[in-house]
């Protein structure tokens, strides 16, 4: 536990890396989902814990890293319990693989609720599996209650639990009505204060607007995306392999190629492993496969998998379980293979450490914010999309800048003629303005795929 928290504190970040992180950070100071602090559904359980920690220590970056460290510990602990339930023995390498996983570590420092949500999802999975395996009614009640809690932390992870819930409804002595009431009790834990803070009518209105927007306007679903199903599928594969496992992809370091050979060997080892589970536990494996398939279809169709690899994180602990099981099985049979694991873990450590080091440097949009705010021009106009404008507006110093939409050609040209300096993320050459500066800002897309490259143009008549 101490190692998980301390390591995440060491790699904490002290800047706002994207628009979603900004909304969660602002929720520590003034929680209001009507003002997108954070965005709907408000993540009240997560924000409550984050606010409590922030009030105790007074540091935004440390707050999210502490939660990330706690979440990492819970993921490791309950993943080992799940692994033991499935194969009836421990895999000592699983803890190391989860601890050093590049995406899990990255999200442990990000100002978001994803990793805390994943820890709850793993706990829910454990209690469902344990109740099914041991016929334990008490653990089943806990599982259903935690499903309700999970919806207040990371509602987009709920589809993963659908096969568990359906199986219990049809096979368990805990009937549909009782199960539903237990889940409702979990929901009411966070829904009651949310209604009190927001108002029922306001909450209803924003929920309808957000659900409609997510699926039909800006949420990155297959309905609104310009990318085909095949493109989305390839991005999911890239997210799992490159972002999630640190595997090789076009443009990546040769070290990730070495890491890839290791993953392939250990996956092969798993496929060759025999008698890794018993017949009476195969129902758990079948349920797990069903959950993975349901969640896969959900993100393929309805999540922004093109720009946000974090949507694949529910897959990672279970992939690492399978690999660690196969690895343990083969090493126990062929002692020589034991020496292969240490160079592999070292490569994984180097890749993850390097990404964490890069994560501590500001993202491209944060670099643009710093450039615009620190530039010595007095009268400033910043032009971009509404979402980029929103990011810059929330930072100290925005009161000295006028923000315009990048398509507002008339307004931009008018301010330019008045002597203002124009900063734009779009090339405005059609407006015949004198360009004074242009430059690209970058960050590693495997740290954060969103806005990994952004260009700024500066125009001034003088």
Predicted regions and their residues:
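Transmembrane-helix motifs of polytopic, lipid-linked glycan transferases
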Residues: 2, 66-88, 123-127, 265-272
């Amino acid at each position: 536990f101490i190692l998980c928290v301390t390591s995440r504190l060491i790699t904490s970040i002290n800047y706002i890396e994207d628009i979603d992180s900004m909304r969660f950070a602002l929720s520590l100071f003034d929680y209001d989902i009507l003002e997108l602090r954070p965005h709907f559904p408000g993540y009240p359980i997560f924000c409550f814990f984050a606010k409590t920690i922030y009030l105790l220590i007074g540091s935004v970056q440390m707050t999210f890293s502490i939660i990330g460290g706690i979440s990492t510990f819970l993921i490791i602990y309950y993943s080992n319990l799940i692994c033991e339930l499935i194969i009836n023995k421990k895999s000592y390498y699983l803890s190391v693989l989860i601890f050093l996983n590049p995406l899990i570590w990255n999200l442990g420092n990000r100002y978001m609720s994803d990793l805390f949500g994943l820890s709850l999802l793993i706990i829910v999975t454990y209690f469902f599996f344990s109740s099914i395996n041991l016929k334990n009614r008490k653990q089943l009640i806990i599982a259903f209650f935690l499903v309700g809690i999970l919806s207040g932390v990371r509602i987009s992870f709920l589809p993963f639990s659908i096969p568990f819930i359906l199986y219990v409804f049809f096979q368990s002595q805990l009937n549909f009505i009782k199960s539903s009431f237990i889940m409702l009790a979990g929901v009411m834990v966070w829904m009651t204060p949310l209604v009190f803070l927001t108002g029922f009518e306001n909450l209803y209105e924003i929920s309808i607007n957000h659900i409609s927007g997510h699926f039909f306007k800006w949420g990155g679903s297959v309905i609104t995306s310009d990318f085909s199903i095949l493109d989305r599928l390839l991005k999911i594969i890239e997210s799992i392999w490159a972002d999630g496992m640190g595997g090789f992809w076009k443009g990546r370091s040769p070290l990730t190629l070495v890491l890839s050979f290791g993953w392939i060997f250990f996956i092969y080892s798993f496929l060759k492993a025999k008698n890794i589970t018993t017949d009476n536990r195969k129902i758990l494996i079948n349920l797990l496969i069903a959950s993975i398939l349901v969640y896969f279809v959900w993100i393929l169709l309805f999540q922004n998998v093109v720009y946000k690899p974090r949507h694949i994180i529910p897959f990672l602990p279970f992939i690492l379980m399978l690999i660690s099981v196969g690895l343990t099985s083969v090493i126990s049979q062929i002692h020589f293979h034991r020496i292969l694991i240490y160079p592999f873990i070292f490569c994984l450590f180097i890749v993850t450490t390097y990404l964490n080091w890069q994560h501590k440097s500001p993202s491209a949009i944060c670099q643009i914010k710093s450039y615009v705010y620190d530039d010595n021009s007095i009268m400033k106009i910043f032009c971009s999309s509404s979402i980029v404008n929103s990011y810059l507006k929330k930072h100290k110093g925005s009161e000295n800048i006028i923000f315009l939409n990048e398509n507002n050609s008339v307004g931009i040209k008018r301010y330019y003629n008045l002597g203002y300096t124009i900063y734009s993320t779009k090339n405005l050459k059609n407006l015949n303005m004198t360009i004074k500066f242009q430059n690209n800002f970058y960050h590693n897309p495997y740290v954060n795929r969103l806005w990994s490259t952004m260009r700024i143009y500066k125009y001034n008549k003088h």
